[in-house]
A protein has these predicted regions:
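Local sequence-structure signature of Cys/Sec-based thiol-disulfide redox active-site neighborhoods
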Residues: 1-22, 26-31
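Thiol/selenol-based redox catalytic cores and closely related redox-interacting motifs
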Residues: 33-116
Length: 116
């Protein structure tokens, strides 16, 4: 299982703590040092069944400075995926990718129902 996170993010820290406390093994990946690629994001989006907007870090400074709230509705899905792949700080975190699931953000109840 792959955990894509930003170490300074308090939500990511909580997620890692939850995984550790529950004895769930994962491989850690720093979202800025190795941001998700276009191909990865496209695959994970398809597997997740979630709307693509859920992959955006809507509370992030980068999202707000680019005024993406207004721009995203006019962009194609392909353009949005390419944009996400340009900067890890645009991506909602943590991202957890398993063989048959993708989690966007930390939701302990959702994680527990799949991982325990």
């Amino acid at each position: 299982m792959l955990l894509i996170e930003y170490p300074k993010c308090s939500t990511c820290q909580k997620a890692k703590c939850w995984l550790d406390e529950n004895g769930i093994a994962y491989t850690d990946r720093h979202i800025l040092e190795q941001p998700p690629t276009y191909e990865e994001l496209k695959e994970w989006h398809a597997r997740s069944g979630l709307p693509l907007r859920r992959f955006f870090n809507t509370s992030g400074l980068k999202y707000k400075s680019l005024a993406l709230k207004d721009k995203l509705p006019t962009m194609t899905e392909d353009e949005q995926l390419h944009l996400l792949a340009t900067d890890g700080m645009l991506v909602k975190r943590p991202l957890v990718v398993g063989d048959d699931f993708v989690f966007v953000g930390f939701k302990p109840d959702e994680w527990a129902s799949t991982l325990k």
